[in-house]
């Protein structure tokens, strides 16, 4: 065996994946390979479940069949150690990223078709160092790039296995353009260590029996379970299953086990003799197709690059664990309920049928209602812990402030004085200019008088245009600019003058009233003194 495993996609400690383009091109751009159609066989699944171990038996068959052209006894000698993709016993992961076997196996069909067979090994899912995104990315990439995706499972096809498959394949489907066709080709469930041969025999027939049971859709099922099964069927053009026995205690418990057939049970070896040709014999190879078109080896490089660019960017949503997804949905429900309560209470305060409120009063009511909404959010029982909840609480506060901004604008629209400000400003400008024009005309300053007449005309035309926009609903953007300009005139010029005049007027009235009060008091005092004096004279007489 002269080939080796080539790391074509590297996994970094920062939970990112990098394409090794040079290594990929070196394998696929060989003269004898690049123009051939490809069959890509990939094995994916949970870590430490024997994926690389299985692939090395695939390699034995490939070298026997396609290199030495003699597959009579392809399993090899009983004492030959297993070589190929790196594997070992134990509980820690061994493979990271995606590996490709450097030897590409070639086959020419009698009809002239030429095919290149590629084997991929993938990083195991659900180890202690991989995030959900890591697992989803590796599984999705291998599914998108392969024509046969082997889903390696332990002991049974369980509901959580199907849920993970749904998540990972949907993550892959999001990255592909929707062509209206099923996005992936063959999915091969491979159930390892099957312990119930009395229910379903080892091999493809027993696997089909179990697969039919697991993927069956019935009216008695919950809609969520029905949807999951329909999703899997909609993603793959072909779905099959194969049941394999346990390879034996010597394989599982011997730390020095190196893959020798003498340590493996006869049942396992018999299953290998059925499984491997079923997938890799010339008549059973599946051409890699994308959008119904067969893919050549040189084109596969472009697909590697395109798919990696998608997963390196931010175009796809972040896949989440079931706990995080449930907790997020739980919090979003609580946020929606709190926002609904805020909206109901604010409608009672300043809704469409309520009168205008002062800014201070509206702000007070907003704070009161906001506290009620936040209290309801806090009172809801939620998953995820305090830190998770705090993120959504802050988001809720921001959302409520944004909603309050809309209520403020709606409330201001009810202010009849503010609504009348624009026409009042332009009319006042016209009146002032008319008066100034008359004054300038009387003193002979006709240039200034004409200018005032011009400004008066512009103000009246603007007023007429504003009225047309207001009641016709057309040119609303320009109408908003007229309102803004009127507000500017009021705030910068007319309001200061108005306030100055009001202050002077109030000061004058207050001064006059004080003088009147003081003058009236003195007169009253003098009158009272005079009366008292008169009374005294009367008494003395």
From Swiss-Prot:
Disruption phenotype: The gene is essential with only a few escapers. Flies display a short life span and are sensitive to mechanical shocks. Following bumping they undergo muscle spasm, followed by paralysis, delayed spasm and finally recovery. The sensitivity to shocks increases with age. InterPro entries: G_GB1_RHD3_dom, Guanylate-bd_C_sf, Guanylate-bd_N, P-loop_NTPase. SUPFAM superfamilies: Interferon-induced guanylate-binding protein 1 (GBP1), C-terminal domain, P-loop containing nucleoside triphosphate hydrolases. Residues 446-448 are lumenal. Signal peptide: none annotated. GO terms for cellular component: cytoplasm; endomembrane system; endoplasmic reticulum; endoplasmic reticulum membrane; Golgi apparatus; Golgi membrane; membrane. This is Atlastin. Changing residue 192 to Q: Sensitivity to mechanical shocks. PANTHER family: GUANYLATE BINDING PROTEIN (PTHR10751). It catalyses: GTP + H2O = GDP + phosphate + H(+). Changing residue 418 to H: Decreased GTPase-dependent fusogenic activity. The modification Phosphothreonine is found at residue 514. It is an enzyme of class 3 (hydrolase). Belongs to the TRAFAC class dynamin-like GTPase superfamily. GB1/RHD3 GTPase family. GB1 subfamily. GO terms for biological process: endoplasmic reticulum membrane fusion; endoplasmic reticulum organization; endoplasmic reticulum tubular network membrane organization; Golgi organization; membrane fusion; microtubule depolymerization; muscle organ development; neuromuscular junction development. The keyword Plastid does not apply. Residues 322-413 are annotated as: 3HB (three-helix bundle) domain. Residues 35-284 form the GB1/RHD3-type G domain. Mg(2+) binds at residues 52, 121. The gene is atl. GDP binds at residues 48-52, 192-193, 251.
């Amino acid at each position: 065996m002269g080939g080796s495993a080539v790391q074509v996609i590297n996994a970094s400690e920062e939970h990112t994946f990098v394409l090794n383009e040079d290594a990929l091109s070196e394998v696929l751009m060989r003269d004898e390979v690049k123009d051939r159609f490809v069959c890509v066989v990939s094995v994916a699944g949970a870590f430490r479940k024997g994926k690389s171990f299985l692939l090395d038996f695939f390699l034995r068959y490939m070298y026997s069949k396609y290199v030495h052209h003699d597959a009579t006894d392809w399993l090899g000698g009983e004492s030959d150690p297993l070589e190929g993709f790196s594997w070992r016993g134990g509980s820690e992961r061994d493979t990271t990223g995606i590996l490709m076997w450097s030897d590409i196996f070639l086959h020419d069909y009698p009809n002239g078709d030429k095919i290149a067979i590629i084997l991929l090994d993938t990083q195991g899912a659900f180890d202690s160092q991989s995030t959900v995104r890591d697992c989803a990315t590796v599984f999705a990439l291998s599914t998108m790039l392969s024509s046969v995706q082997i889903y390696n499972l332990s002991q049974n096809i369980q509901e959580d296995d199907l849920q993970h498959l749904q998540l990972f394949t949907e993550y892959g489907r999001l990255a592909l353009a929707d062509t209206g066709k099923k996005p992936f080709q063959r999915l091969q469930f491979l159930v390892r260590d099957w312990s119930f041969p009395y229910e379903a025999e080892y091999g493809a027939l027993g696997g089909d029996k179990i697969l039919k049971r697991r993927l069956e859709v019935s009216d008695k099922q919950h809609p969520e379970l029905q949807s999951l099964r329909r999703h899997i069927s909609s993603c793959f053009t072909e779905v099959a299953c194969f049941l394999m026995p346990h390879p034996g205690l010597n394989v599982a418990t011997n730390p020095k086990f190196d893959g020798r057939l003498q340590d493996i049970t006869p049942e396992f070896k018999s299953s290998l003799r059925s499984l491997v040709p079923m997938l890799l014999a010339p008549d059973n190879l599946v051409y890699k197709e994308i959008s119904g078109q067969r893919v050549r080896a040189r084109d596969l490089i472009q697909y590697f690059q395109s798919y990696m660019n998608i997963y390196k960017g931010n175009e796809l949503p972040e896949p989440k664990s079931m706990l995080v997804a449930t907790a997020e949905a739980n919090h979003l429900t609580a946020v929606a309920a709190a926002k609904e309560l805020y909206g109901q209470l604010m409608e009672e305060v300043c809704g469409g049928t309520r009168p205008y409120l002062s800014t201070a009063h509206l702000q007070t009511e907003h704070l009161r209602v906001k506290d009620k909404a936040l209290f309801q959010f806090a009172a809801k029982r939620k998953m995820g812990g305090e830190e998770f909840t705090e993120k959504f609480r802050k988001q809720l506060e921001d959302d409520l402030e944004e909603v309050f901004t809309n209520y403020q604008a709606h409330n201001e629209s009810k202010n009849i004085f503010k609504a009348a400000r624009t026409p009042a400003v332009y009319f006042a400008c016209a009146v002032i200019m008319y008066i100034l024009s008359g004054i300038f005309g009387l003193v002979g300053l006709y240039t200034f008088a004409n200018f005032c007449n011009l400004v008066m005309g512009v103000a009246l035309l603007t007023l007429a245009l504003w009225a047309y926009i207001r009641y016709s609903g057309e040119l609303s953007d320009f109408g908003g600019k007229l309102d803004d300009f009127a507000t500017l005139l009021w705030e910068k010029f007319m309001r200061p003058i108005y306030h100055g005049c009001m202050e002077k007027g109030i000061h004058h009235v207050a001064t006059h009233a004080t003088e009147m009060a003081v003058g009236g008091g003195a007169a009253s005092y003098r009158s009272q003194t005079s009366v008292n004096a008169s009374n005294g004279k009367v008494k003395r007489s």
